[in-house]
Design a protein with these regions (language model features):
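Flexible "stalk/tail and boundary" regions
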Residues: 1-10, 14-15, 24-81, 85-86, ...
């Protein structure tokens, strides 16, 4: 699978569709799964990556309350989606409502998944959390 990289800004159309960067489209040619992500965004996984992540989540013990809660959110908020012929992805209204995506969306490549943010929420996130990246405290090899 091609790496999903970069930050792209798009307007949602009146139906709630967002265009994907042309270099992302091949990764989602076999379909995608949208689900609620952490930090106020949506995660969008290519179908093959979703299958791998699903196996990991399904392996969480049913006896663990946090594991059950995580699985409920991960699967319960998920929606299988397809790209249309113009490379657009329809974001279901209920998911747009969950993360506050209205008119402008940020499409962020995060290596093996895509994140979709409301533009204003993404700007707030970067202002609040950009310091951790600048400090390099989680950079590989620094722990």
């Amino acid at each position: 699978m091609a790496e999903l990289l970069g930050t792209h800004s798009y307007q949602l159309d009146p139906k709630g569709r967002v265009s994907l960067p042309s270099r992302f489209r091949e990764a989602f040619a076999d379909g995608a799964v949208l689900t609620l992500g952490q930090d106020g965004c949506l995660f969008c996984f290519p179908r093959a990556e979703w299958e791998e992540r699903s196996r990991e989540v399904r392996s969480l013990p049913l006896s663990d309350a946090e594991g059950r809660a995580y699985a409920r959110m991960f699967f319960g908020k998920a929606e299988a989606v397809e790209l249309d012929s113009q490379g657009r992805l329809l974001i279901p209204q209920r998911l747009r409502n969950e993360v506050g995506i209205r008119k402008e969306a940020i499409v962020l490549g995060v290596f093996d998944r895509m994140e979709i943010w409301d533009k204003d929420a993404h700007e707030r996130y970067e202002l609040t959390h950009g310091g951790a990246y600048q400090a390099g405290t989680l950079e590989p090899g620094t722990r």
